[in-house]
Design a protein with these regions (language model features):
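Conserved glycine-rich cofactor-binding loop
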Residues: 32-34
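Substrate-binding pocket helix/loop in short-chain dehydrogenase/reductase
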Residues: 115-116, 123-125
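Active-site loop immediately N-terminal to the catalytic Tyr-X3-Lys motif
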Residues: 117, 163-169, 191
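Active-site helix of classical SDR
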Residues: 139, 174
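Alpha-helical segment proximal to the catalytic Tyr-Lys
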Residues: 144, 187-188
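Residue(s) in the substrate-gating loop at a strand-loop-helix junction
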Residues: 158
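C-terminal helical subdomain
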Residues: 191, 198, 215-283
Length: 285
């Protein structure tokens, strides 16, 4: 059972591998808005070198300005992740330009609300390409950069990938796929210095698929209030520092961030397993 906020215990028998990310390269997709922007800006503040992507140049530059404004280092790539050729260009650029890639955060996602009766093939295929196919092949091509010294792969999931929701068939299928991909890759890389985990952001965090303009429009028709994704920064910082030992888990970002606030970031393997929503058997044994 996951631990609740405010519960701390200190069994120090088992440790896991971590490495500071200060001065190291981290790739965050979908960093032009929402959760992706919050993750990138927080990691920039703690000294990571950021590679960030978005399909919208104006939004991406806003994120980059925030990172540079706090003294951070960032490279931007405007990219349509549904394009195989553009995805290949991104992996080429990272391979050629990264001195030490330590974390891949597959965050970019699109969400089109359509019932099965009304779903169109092009919409279905685009959702799967951005939300699932791109993370799989981006990770495949960049894993060799992590292999020697280790690293962390963080796949952004959703409650839609755990529960399923009406009128979100393509999105839910893609997020269930992300959960399966995370578990399969964790098993394949078991025993290495590479951690593979998924994260559900929580309902209070504005989805990356919702633009800043959408937020303004929604505020006139709903009482929905989103929290600043920066509050999740400590959770993603901790996960980005992992180098094996914690893998095949699904974390709720808000729960993990609250636990870190209560207990600090020097957590044991048992504590992280206890706070995880799901732990894949056999990976860390």
């Amino acid at each position: 059972m996951p631990m609740q906020s405010g519960q701390c215990w200190g069994d120090q028998r088992v440790k896991y591998l971590t490495e500071p990310i200060e001065g190291m390269d981290v790739l965050v997709t979908g960093a032009g808005r929402g959760l992706g922007r919050g993750i990138a800006c927080f990691l920039g503040q703690v000294g990571a070198h950021l590679w960030i992507t978005s399909e919208v140049e104006e939004e991406l530059e806003k994120t980059a300005e925030n990172i540079r404004g706090s003294g951070g280092w960032v490279k931007t790539r405007v990219i349509d992740l549904a394009s195989e050729s553009q995805l290949s260009m991104l992996t080429r650029d990272v391979k050629q330009g990264s001195s030490r890639l330590v974390a891949i955060i597959n965050n970019a996602a699109v969400l089109e609300r359509q019932s099965l009766q009304h779903i169109q093939r092009d919409s279905w295929e685009h959702t799967l390409q951005v939300n699932l196919t791109a993370p799989v092949f981006l990770t495949r091509d960049l894993v060799p950069l992590l292999s020697d010294e280790g690293g962390s792969i963080i796949n952004i999931s959703s409650r839609a990938g755990v529960l399923g929701f009406a009128d979100q068939t393509a999105y839910c299928a893609s997020k269930f796929g992300i959960e399966a991909f995370t578990r399969c890759l964790a098993l394949e890389l078991s025993g290495s210095k590479i951690s593979v985990n998924s994260v559900t952001p929580g309902l209070k965090i504005k989805p990356t698929s919702i633009t800043d303009a959408d937020v303004v429009a929604l505020q006139s028709t709903t009482s929905q209030a989103w929290s600043d994704p920066a509050i999740l920064g400590p959770a993603f910082h901790l996960l980005a520092c992992l180098r094996g030992g914690i893998s095949g888990c699904r974390f709720d970002a808000i729960t993990l961030a609250n636990y870190i606030a209560d207990c600090g970031s020097e957590l044991t393997l048992e504590q992280l397993h206890a706070v995880a929503e799901y732990v894949l058997p056999g990976v860390d044994e």
